[in-house]
Amino acid sequence: MKRLVVCWLVAAACRSPAIPEANRFPAGTGFTARHVTVDGTTLRYIDSGRGTPVVFLHGLGASMYAWRKNLEPIARAGYRVIAFDNRGFGFSDKPATGYDNASYARLTVALLDSLHLPDAVLVGHSMGGAVAAEVAIAHPERVRGLVLIGSAGLGAREPRLFRVGRWPLLGPLLFAFRGRGLTERLLQATYADPRKVSDADVDQYYAPVAEPAYGRALRAVLREFRFDALAGRLDHIRAPTLVLWGEADRLVPITLGRTLAAGIPRAAFLSVPGAGHSVQEEAPDEVNRLLIRFLKDGLARVPGDLAFGHWADIFPQPSG
């Protein structure tokens, strides 16, 4: 164990300069980054398109860059897409506290209020899925539909790095040395095929990590956020729900995805072959196809008593 920690510290100490602000996502796209202050936190966000609003919530250690391959196709299909760097991540504020599940849910609702949205479809990945589900439980009237992608909420085996990060002495030291190489390895672990992670991807993920407040915020998340908070509460989710999983997810096992879907009254479970935890990044075409199908057909056609596994007419499997 000590040897592993030392290796992490040595790797993390290899710091690299972050990309310039002018090159940060969404630079080079048709989107524009905006800022809004809600619930005492200034959030960096994207808001584009018309139609039913779809709000994207990223996972632990990520930012709205995690949705770079999904936003434009969903907007082009006729939807209003909203993505944001959540509190403590990306280039949004990183206060000392406010990282528990209820606080993140309240922040999400405050963002909807600031955008004058009575409700929206929430799409959450990993930790963002747990936040989206928390909103659906605590504020059901604000959630028109729910998409949970490789979602946290039922507990999963944490990377050892995160467990060490909670240690009183080693935690601050570990997160003080956040190198680009460490970011690259963590990102590759979320893919079934690590070769699909590009240098540009690593640059974008590393840019906020290099900020001084990032380590403190990440430690606060690991202290305050419960990654098993949905256990025993899934039947409180009333929104029509699509649960998506990469079949090669090594961080949150696919068995948890099936359990998640089975516990939600109006849910369907679908898996994507050959994709890991970051399935929306690794297999974007398939994820976008399923998302659009859910938005076009699933929201309107799902009856309140629909049982798990009966969505074959909405989501036919591709032939061949």
Residues of each region from the PLM?
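Conserved alpha/beta-hydrolase catalytic His-Asp/Glu region
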Residues: 162-163, 176-236
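Catalytic active-site module of serine/aspartate enzymes centered on a nucleophile-bearing elbow/loop
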Residues: 267-268, 272-318
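Short glycine-enriched nucleophile-adjacent loop
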Residues: 129-140, 146
